[in-house]
Amino acid sequence: MVMNERDRKQRLYVAEQGRKLAAGKISRREFLRRAALAGFGVSAAGLMRMQTARAATSPVRLREGIYQLSDDQKKWLETVGKRFAGTTVRIASESTAPSQIISDLAKQEFEPLTGITINWEQQPLDQVLSKITQDTATESSSNDIYYLDQAWVGRFVEDTVDPKALLDDTSSELNMPDYNFDDFVPELIPALAAYQGRLVGLPFDIPIFVYMYRKDVYDALGLKPATTMAEFLENVRATDMYKAADGSEVRGYIGQWKSGHYALQCDWTAWLWSHGGSHTGLDGAVLIDDEKAVAGANYMLELGKHVPAGVTTWDWGGQGDAMAQGLGANVISWAEFFPGLDVPDRSKTVGAWETADLPMEIELRTETSFDEKPAIGHQGGSCIALSKYSQVQEAAWIFLQWATSAPVAIAAAESSNTPVRTSAFSAPNVLEKAKVTAGTTRHFPAVLKAIKERMGTEPHFPGWAAASGTGGPIPTELGKMTTGAQDVATTLANIKKAIEEAIAEE
């Protein structure tokens, strides 16, 4: 679809709102609302990352031998890549773990071999969106590679170069030897990087929910990891009020239940979806108040009888801290928390937490709208794509392949970054760190299984971000329910109305 004048004006409008946000003239929530009205929503993980922007870290230091190119790959960078020495490739992305790790690695390894300079600007997601909408509206070449939240993939499909078409050109010297596109975890391609069968970018990151439990507590009580939702609740009840060796009290469940915060919406989806509910049904219908959703809400409130004090003030950061402090025994949440639990100066529970397969949902709804996919493994992720407006496309394509290649994915996994390539999950350095240690990868098997079999995706329509994000009506109403200020029926009725209004704004 060629960009029309209405689309162009919408993009320029979003770019202008981004500048207002950066100048402090509007709030982030207002930016999300205005961007949504222009047709640019943000995914679940995008909202999470937006509110947990990482501070700059010291450059990554890899152990000897972790980053290993094949001889053909190294020769290709030194010969084909070197043709573009002196070229600068520009990319703007969020400041996430993979962006930090790979940008550091580019300075250390890619630039010396090729002579290509990588200008990687790391910003909040709202500013990334502002840049991309400005660039595409004006067909500017100011960024050569786009970082795309999964909710934007369909909107920018015509502004990118199809990477599969480039990879399928077997005669091109610009294609990286041994790149092996089929090594990407296949479930990630349609979820993060494709639109209506057309590849838009290449998978880059994948936050996802996993089941984490206190093995020391389970062992003491003779428990096994839950395989069903009923068993999970039984384990929550059985572990609640457990007395640890130091005399501290362990509660049954740790939530991310901060009233009005997007984290609460994330937590809620696990119980909604696992009970056969969903936000949407066929043809844009909103089903959030049906009997399945009611069952999910009641299950959530039952968990709420077994949580530490203060849970309704915790976002995902508070939840992660509570895990590290040993305040609970069961969690279904973001796998990104897990490596920090094995760091002695951050955690009182080093080695105590384990992962297990997510408990099976009672049932799953299969007929939904707006790309919603109910499943307990709440996911979110992004891809990176080649701009069709870039004036240095060949150099940018060389870098894009290197940045998403198996050797780089394996090196990034050294810092506990969740891989998007199958080979990285079984690489020797990854398996070596599957033990209790800083930078552990012992949670990776649970992550891979969640990606391949249990991924759940929130709806993707423009108004979703403003409705479900922090300060929006959905987490605000959920907060009333989890604090006892409002009953389930009223809460779900109000959420239904909010979602219907958000859809109507398209």
Report residues per predicted region.
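Hinge/lid segment of periplasmic solute-binding proteins
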Residues: 60-83, 150-209, 249, 264, ...
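Short, well-ordered beta-strand elements
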Residues: 64, 85-96, 116-121, 144-145, ...
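N-terminal secretory signal peptides
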Residues: 1-30, 52-54
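Glycine-centered hinge/linker elements that transmit conformational signals in sensory
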Residues: 235-240, 282-313, 357-361
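Extracytoplasmic "Venus flytrap"/periplasmic binding protein-like
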Residues: 105-187, 216-227, 322, 329-330, ...
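C-terminal capping/gating helix-and-loop segments adjacent to ligand/active sites or protein-protein/ligand interfaces
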Residues: 439-498
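Extracytoplasmic/periplasmic solute-binding protein
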Residues: 191-204, 209, 233-286, 292, ...
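N-terminal export signals
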Residues: 30-56
